[in-house]
A protein has these predicted regions:
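Short linear clamp-binding motif
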Residues: 1-7, 204, 224-228
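Conserved RNase H-like, two-metal-ion catalytic cores of nucleic-acid enzymes
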Residues: 2-81
Length: 228
């Protein structure tokens, strides 16, 4: 059997489509109260400061990174970036990233332009590499993105999430963006390994980046990056 022919469409249980993209997601959050570090993990006590996506349309991959002080704009930008056929991918994305964004959307009064089906064992809308690895067993201890990336030969994380709060306090948005983008690239490589695919090269000039501390979005040139 040629295992490399298996694709995320097969794993997700849906047919391939020109409109269907794999959108790898990672978010960074901070506590509303800086003295409560664990508050960053709960949508009632934390907020999103960066959302990074890597969209693979079967031909090329491009990055979209939304970061800054205007959380409502960041989250609305995430929902607007999703297309109807997109499959959202990430590590622990079901229990954290998507849940957090949905809950913050309720709090901020943002209506998503689509509903992601996050039912257990259902992978047409969302594929979680953590659940893929553990086969929904609930035995998640030690299965971090860093550990899984290392075990699969995909690389390791380039920083620590604990640094995000400090960067935020120092208004160092660029460091938060770089850290979030590096995580999303690692998650993409892990997903490709688990689904027997080759990571695509990041498309030149296709990365959209805006920081909400400025009035208008700016599109930045993205250097050609080999994701393998």
């Amino acid at each position: 059997m040629d295992y490399k022919r298996k694709s995320n469409e097969q794993i997700g249980g849906a047919q391939a489509s020109e409109d269907r993209r794999t959108v790898v997601l990672d978010i960074e959050t901070v506590a509303l109260d800086p003295s409560n570090e664990k508050g960053a993990l709960d949508a009632m006590t934390g907020r999103a400061v960066c959302i990074s996506m890597l969209a693979d349309d079967g031909k090329a991959a491009k990055e979209i990174t939304l970061a800054g002080e205007d959380e409502a704009r960041i989250i609305a930008g995430f929902w607007d970036a999703l297309r109807p056929g997109d499959v959202v991918v990430g590590h622990n994305v079901l229990d954290f990233d998507i849940r957090f964004l949905q809950q913050r959307s309720w709090i901020l009064g943002i209506q998503p332009n689509r509903t992601l089906d996050t039912r257990k064992y259902y992978t047409a809308d969302v594929i979680d590499t953590l659940q893929l690895w553990t086969n929904w067993s609930g035995n998640k201890k030690g299965v971090t993105l860093d550990a899984l990336g290392s075990a699969l030969g995909c690389g390791r994380k380039t920083g620590e999430g604990a640094n995000v709060a400090q960067w935020w306090a120092e208004h160092d948005i660029d460091s938060i963006k770089r850290y979030c983008q590096d995580d999303v690239r690692l998650a993409y490589r892990v997903f490709c390994r688990l689904t027997y695919q080759e990571p695509r090269q990041l498309a030149l000039n296709e990365g959209q980046l805006f920081t909400t501390s400025v009035m208008e979005p700016t599109v930045n040139r993205v250097a050609e990056v080999r994701l393998t």
